[in-house]
């Protein structure tokens, strides 16, 4: 299953991370719908708003179905046929949707039949492993392996469409297959857009943590086909729904257990052997500053906005091809950052908020 995610990037940086090619091969950035509803967070839970990609054709009848929109949507699908005036009164859980029953349950079959497919964006997701012989559960952060590309430059250098994709050399966002629906309050009011994340059996690498995982769309082709309901039928799109082994993970602190905790500490690897958090060195602090390019809260007029050109970049010496995890607790790229120069620089205090 998938019940907690992280999506901390500020809006402009998230947009650049979603650069794509349209059907004509032109580099594009997706446009936003209801951008003010997006609230970055290291610790997103159901009923919060998360950014999703969807086809522009859902909003404009004559649009090219390969063109994309980013829209914040409520996590937890509210069916269009729901009759109550309060969506929180929905009596069943729609946070996730099992792939093996998606065409059996009305809540998911109807919007899927209308082409309401979306891609849920996240840095990664959290999952909890039940510790044998105890009631305790160990949380893990799960994400795409971060691979060094041939791209160069900085985010601030993206001064033309041709450069948008070339300069994005940062964290690869996790792209999860979702279904959305549109609910209109019986008494009138704004339409509520909400989504569910499709889940599949866990891949071998995650099976020790949990028996289910999100349906991850690995690569631009898979994302394009899932979104393009104008050209790709439901039957063809469902062939994209399957487990993937192209993931990595590391153990994190129990700080993430409380969804009100919203700091980079939620993502920081912990050492399960000594049961303590890896202390943050100067290098890891710079990494955490990148994770916190902007405080994960709604825009505050009192706080000057950081210029795009000031957003730190991943150093090429750390952006190496990450091997698939061979054992539980592999921390991958984040752990390399947190461990580097541990003994060479003064220990910095870790950010924490309750």
From Swiss-Prot:
State where composition is biased (Basic and acidic residues): 296-309, 337-348
Indicate the residues that form the catalytic site. 2, 127
Give the free-text PTM comment from the record.
Ubiquitinated; the covalent HMCES DNA-protein cross-link is ubiquitinated, leading to its degradation by the proteasome.
- Where would I look for the motif PIP-box in this sequence? 332-338
Query: Where is the site Required to stabilize abasic sites?
Result: 210
Q: What switches its activity on or off, per the activity regulation note?
A: Formation and reversal of DNA-protein cross-link depends on DNA context. Catalyzes formation of the thiazolidine linkage in presence of abasic sites in single-stranded DNA. Mediates the reversal of the thiazolidine cross-link in presence of double stranded DNA.
Which controlled-vocabulary keywords does the entry list?
Answer: Autocatalytic cleavage, Chromosome, Covalent protein-DNA linkage, DNA damage, DNA-binding, Hydrolase, Isopeptide bond, Lyase, Phosphoprotein, Protease, Ubl conjugation
An example GO biological process term is:
proteolysis
Protein location: Chromosome
Q: Which domain of life is it from?
A: Eukaryota
Output the InterPro entries linked to this UniProt entry.
Answer: SRAP, SRAP-like
About its domains, the entry says: The N-terminal catalytic Cys-2 residue forms a thiazolidine linkage to a ring-opened DNA abasic site. Glu-127 catalyzes reversal of the thiazolidine linkage; self-reversal is favoured by duplex DNA formation. Glu-127 is also involved in sensing abasic sites in single-stranded DNA (ssDNA). His-210 stabilizes the abasic sites by forming a hydrogen bond with the O4' hydroxyl group.
The record's family statement is: Belongs to the SOS response-associated peptidase family.
What is the name of the protein in this document? Abasic site processing protein HMCES
Q: Which organism is it from?
A: Homo sapiens (Human)
Name of the gene encoding the protein in the UniProt record? HMCES
């Amino acid at each position: 299953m998938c019940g907690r995610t992280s999506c901390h990037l500020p809006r402009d940086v998230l947009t650049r991370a979603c650069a794509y090619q349209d059907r004509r091969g032109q580099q594009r950035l997706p446009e936003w719908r209801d951008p003010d509803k997006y609230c970055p967070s290291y610790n997103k839970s159901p009923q919060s708003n998360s950014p999703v990609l969807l086809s522009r054709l859902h909003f404009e009848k004559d649009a090219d179905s390969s063109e994309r929109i980013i829209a914040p949507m409520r996590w937890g699908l509210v069916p269009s046929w729901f009759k109550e005036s309060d969506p929180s009164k929905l009596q069943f859980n729609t946070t996730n949707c099992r792939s093996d029953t998606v065409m059996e349950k009305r809540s998911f079959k109807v919007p899927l039949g209308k082409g309401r497919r979306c891609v849920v964006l996240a840095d990664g997701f959290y999952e909890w492993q039940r510790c044998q012989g105890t009631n305790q559960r160990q949380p893990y952060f799960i994400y795409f392996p971060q691979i060094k590309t041939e791209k160069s430059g900085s985010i601030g250098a993206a001064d033309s469409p041709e450069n948008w994709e070339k300069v994005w050399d940062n964290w690869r966002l996790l792209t999860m297959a979702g279904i959305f629906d549109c609910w209109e309050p019986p008494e009138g009011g704004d339409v509520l857009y909400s989504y569910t994340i499709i889940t599949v059996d866990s891949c071998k690498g995650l099976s020790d943590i949990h028996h289910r995982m999100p349906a991850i769309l690995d690569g631009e082709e898979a994302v394009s086909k899932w979104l393009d309901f104008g050209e790709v039928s439901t039957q063809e799109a469902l062939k994209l729904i399957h487990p993937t082994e192209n993931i990595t993970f590391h153990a994190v602190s129990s700080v993430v257990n409380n969804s009100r905790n919203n700091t980079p500490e939620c993502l920081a690897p912990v050492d399960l052997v000594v049961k303590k958090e890896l202390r943050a060195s100067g290098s890891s602090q710079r990494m955490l500053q990148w994770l916190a390019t902007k405080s994960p809260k709604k825009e505050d007029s009192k706080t000057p906005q950081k210029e795009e050109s000031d957003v730190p970049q991943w150093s090429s010496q750390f952006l190496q091809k990450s091997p698939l995890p061979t054992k539980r607790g592999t921390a991958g790229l984040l752990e390399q950052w947190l461990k580097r120069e541990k003994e060479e620089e003064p220990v910095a205090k870790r950010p924490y908020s309750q």
